[in-house]
Amino acid sequence: MSVPSSLSQSAINANSHGGPALSFPLPLHAAHNQLLNAKLQATAVVPKDLRSAMGEGSVPEPGPANAKWLKEGQNQLRRAATAHRDQNRNVTLTLAEEASQEAETAPLGPKGLMHLYSELELSAHNAANRGLHGSALIINTQEQGPDEGEEKAAGEAEEDDEDEEEEEEEEDLSSPPGLPEPLENVEVPSGPQALTDGPREHSKSASLLFGMRNSAASDEDSSWATLSQGSPSYGSPEDTDSFWNPNAFETDSDLPAGWMRVQDTSGTYYWHIPTGTTQWEPPGRASPSQGSSPQEESQLTWTGFAHQEGFEEGEFWKDEPSEEAPMELGLKDPEEATLSFPAQSLSPEPVPQEEEKLSQRNANPGIKCFAVRSLGWVEMTEEELAPGRSSVAVNNCIRQLSYHKNNLHDPMAGGWGEGKDLLLQLEDETLKLVEPQNQTLLHAQPIVSIRVWGVGRDSGSNRDFAYVARDKLTQMLKCHVFRCEAPAKNIATSLHEICSKIMSERRNARCLVNGLSLDHSKLVDVPFQVEFPAPKNELVQKFQVYYLGNVPVAKPVGVDVINGALESVLSSSSREQWTPSHVSVAPATLTILHQQTEAVLGECRVRFLSFLAVGRDVHTFAFIMAAGPASFCCHMFWCEPNAASLSEAVQAACMLRYQKCLDARSQTSTSCLPAPPAESVARRVGWTVRRGVQSLWGSLKPKRLGSQTP
């Protein structure tokens, strides 16, 4: 364990904070050989308990300062720096653990007492510093034990050589440049007050002490104390030799929000507090660029995204230094500075003529322009665009093309314009990609044919826009991804507005079609899908019969009328003259069709049927229809094996039609239809119409008798 021999009285007093001063019974600055000589060995007394070890007993006179301890401390710090150990982290045990271990295994020699006192002193410093930072600033060099073991192994035979070396080293290292005069009486705070009083001053003094000692260790080790905002200072603000003056941190009204001007020995630079970015130039004139920050380039590694996405080691990139013009958009997020191409403006500084063209385009409300750069396209399947999966698939395409390791300027990547700056225009319901220099149209995509569009959801990908559409030549689905200069949600919002406008126009067009005030010339390309309710198919029964023909009759009802017509036709014609045909019976219509030619021989409405009956022969069937005012016609049929099925079907159609007429007629309106049976009519209309119903009943009675005859 090495103890620095060049401590300032003010630094030690700042650490003690007025605690009880303790003196060590042994000179901590004496050489090894001086402590081990015969005189000291004869007079040295081992303390009986820890209280005497802490220096509360008698105190002998301290010996002269020894420069060899300083040499050992510097050598051990140099070796620790070579082994890449963190000099700002203390790996010593706690004060209680060290005290218990030292009490059990304390050596009985004077050299063991010297190590005990030095360790107690350093433990007090560590406990005080741990109160503020959680870890002390003092380095435990006890692990560098091989040097100490070599000294013990060498024994007294090498003491004479060490005396000669000490004399030479004292001449070189007795007064190193920049170090104050050594102190002989070093006071170390003890008790609980040393752990609680003034943790801020403890940390500053300890940082000053070991920062100065490390600065003298070696040239290559001096780089650990960088000049960034995270590095410890070499002293407290009250010290006159501090590298930081009281006005080191300044906030100027000329600086943007979040910026601070920092002054130190390296110069004046500007610190952006939210992101931790530093730059030499004032932030008002240019944003931070690579190569201008005093921080190390390793600090630009994208580490925040690694925990979220779990990329492999090769997926993290650093921003390469760029010598191009600074960005026009000001300070960007720190994640965006680590993308695969340099964090610069997607388009160079426009010439005044180009600015005028852009302003003219933006002035036109029908055209919206966005500066983009094509990252390529990825082939997709129809299953990936299913509801609930399309958003995940599009985001995966954005992630794949945004963070891949290949060169984005490679023309084989599938990007429009070979990775150069483009203009994405939304004009006349069309998405266009235009080359900004010569206004060459590279691609035109109708917005109505775009299946899906979206914006990157990952951290730092809010400037990535993608849309999915079917290629005209290959008919495959492609997801095109673009890196936008402005937030990509602006493009998505504009597309949403255009689609809403298109849907509104189509709804208005449908309303015009329904109102029969439509200009068909404007709706040639608009597909209309009008769904009409399917017509209800009525039950139709077909019967194979022989059609005997039709004859006019004098009365609309009567079995004798039907029998007379059937007898006249059967007597005047033979079976060969009958026409084979089909009779289709529907609830509304009776249709007679030719069996071979399907020609319509007759069509009768059921509502005009006045009477039906089966003839004297069970194979014959006939019904009377009203052909006009006071004009009636009788249609006759020959059925096989009998006419029962046909007569029942026609009777059922008549009953269904009659029921529909009753349902459609209002209760107060009168009807010209034949009345139902007398009993039901009497219940409805009362006794006032009984006489009229009875007269109708007389006309319907022969119908019932005729329908029951075989």
UniProtKB/Swiss-Prot annotation:
Keyword Cell membrane: yes
Residues annotated with Phosphotyrosine modification: Y547
Keyword terms of this UniProt record: Acetylation, Activator, Apoptosis, Cell membrane, Cell projection, Chromatin regulator, Cytoplasm, DNA damage, Membrane, Nucleus, Phosphoprotein, Repeat, Repressor, Transcription, Transcription regulation, Ubl conjugation
Residue spans of biased composition, Acidic residues class: 145-173
Subcellular location: Cell membrane; Cytoplasm; Nucleus; Cell projection, Growth cone
Gene Ontology cellular-component annotations: cytoplasm; glutamatergic synapse; growth cone; lamellipodium; neuromuscular junction; nuclear speck; nucleus; plasma membrane
Pfam families xrefs: PID (PF00640), WW (PF00397)
List of residues that carry N6-acetyllysine: K204, K701
InterPro entries with a match to the protein in the record: APBB1/2/3, PH-like_dom_sf, PTB/PI_dom, WW_dom, WW_dom_sf
Ranges annotated as biased composition (Low complexity): 287-299
Domain WW span(s) in chain numbering: 253-285
Chief location bin: membrane
Domain PID: start-end pairs: 370-509, 542-699
Physiological role: Transcription coregulator that can have both coactivator and corepressor functions. Adapter protein that forms a transcriptionally active complex with the gamma-secretase-derived amyloid precursor protein (APP) intracellular domain. Plays a central role in the response to DNA damage by translocating to the nucleus and inducing apoptosis. May act by specifically recognizing and binding histone H2AX phosphorylated on 'Tyr-142' (H2AXY142ph) at double-strand breaks (DSBs), recruiting other pro-apoptosis factors such as MAPK8/JNK1.
Name of the molecule in the record: Amyloid beta precursor protein binding family B member 1
Organism name: Mus musculus
UniProt lineage: Eukaryota, Metazoa, Chordata, Craniata, Vertebrata
Gene expressing this chain: Apbb1
